[in-house]
Amino acid sequence: GVLTDPRECDIDISVEMPKEFLIDDSMIIKPAENGKDVEVVRGPNIKPFPVNKPLGDNLEGKVLIKVGDNITTDHIMPSNSKLLPFRSNIPYLSEYCFNTVDEEFPKRAKENNGGIIVAGNNYGQGSSREHAALAPLYLGVKAVIAKSFARIHKANLINNGIIPMEFEAEVDYDKVGLLDELVIADVQSALVNGKAIIKNVTNGSFFSAYINLTEKEIDVIKAGGRLNYVKIKG
């Protein structure tokens, strides 16, 4: 056979539309009028989704881990045969966050009520794994200060209300150490201005970091992540 333009064929290709389409939605359970009264039934290995809180006026926390260049999402949240069955159990998975880099990270994060991650270039490369943002969120990570980010992981951090910042001067990376206490005063203005002045309380120094976000991404961060943002917007 050959490809033929149907307009050149002497064939009636008209289709008569029915007066109405039969719709059977009897198998669809309509949402309750008051969703607050609905109980979500979860299996023993399915835990509630972690949701961040709206951003406050100031951001402060200790450096929970300092990593080098090209940290992958698999470094951040390993996904091997032992952990895959727990993909819906973020509390359990978080115990293995950065497990291949620093086994003490989860414990350190809990002891300090969360904090900040410091990283080199291309942080979050590789798989677009959302768990690499969800596990740090569950452990209280508020921001990641890196030399540069992999694009998709940066988007996942924003969606979870974790602020991605980039060192203005890469040499400042060497001036920050593990468990240094960092403070960003008036972080709300820093988001709008696209630049944060960060005080290292531990050694008394200051350094700057860019916050390259769109207007919508800023609103998402302020809301504490995309779920909160959507809830606010209705």
Q: Where would I find each of the regions flagged by the language model?
A:
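Fe-S-dependent hydro-lyases/dehydratases of central metabolism
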Residues: G1-G234
